Amino acid sequence: WVALHDADIITYDRSMVARLLYPVAHPTFGYAFSKGYYYRASLDGGRLNGRVTRLFVAPLVRALALTFGRSDYLDYIGSFRYPLAGECAMDLSVARSIRIPSDWGLEIGVLGEVFRHHTSARVCQVDVADVYDHKHRELSADDASAGLHKMSVDIAKAVFRKMAISGVVLTPE
């Protein structure tokens, strides 16, 4: 089995790895891939995190479905409680069959690869932490090469690439 998780987790607890691996490693569950999720509030409870998912990915997926029509891929991405979670686990069949992106599109890209190569019946979601926080990025509204701006661009490219590969014609309009 292979488990991946963010390297900048402030509230890291080694039980996260066990929670991720359990459904994949259990011999009777039949899961090949597990995706982590967690409550995205700040440690002091005063701020709701997960800005890119809440303000970009979820609206993008809904807008694309409205624009191009329903698709299995968009339904699949939309079904994840936190698609940008950096925590996932997989068996070796998944690990050997997917390409892992090397930019901020990694999480969406991995989900797209799992979607392409494996049935969703072998995918599960796991609540990996009661308390979760990691280092946060600046918005960088004026710099497309940094912060959340760069992250959003990379994620959009990963989604658009997957849609184009599946036959959706994307035009500059």
Predicted features along the sequence, with ranges:
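Short beta-strand-to-loop acidic/aromatic patch adjacent to the donor-nucleotide binding site
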Residues: 1-12
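Conserved donor-nucleotide/metal-binding helix-loop-beta segment in metal-dependent transferases, i.e.
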Residues: 13-42
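A recurrent flexible, glycine/aromatic-enriched loop bordering the glycosyltransferase active site
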Residues: 44-51, 65-87
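Residues that recognize and position ribonucleotide moieties
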Residues: 54, 88, 104
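Conserved Class I S-adenosyl-L-methionine
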Residues: 57-62
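Short, well-ordered alpha-helical scaffold segment located
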Residues: 89, 93-94
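Conserved nucleotide-sugar donor-binding catalytic segment
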Residues: 96-102
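C-terminal catalytic/acceptor-binding lobe
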Residues: 104, 108-173
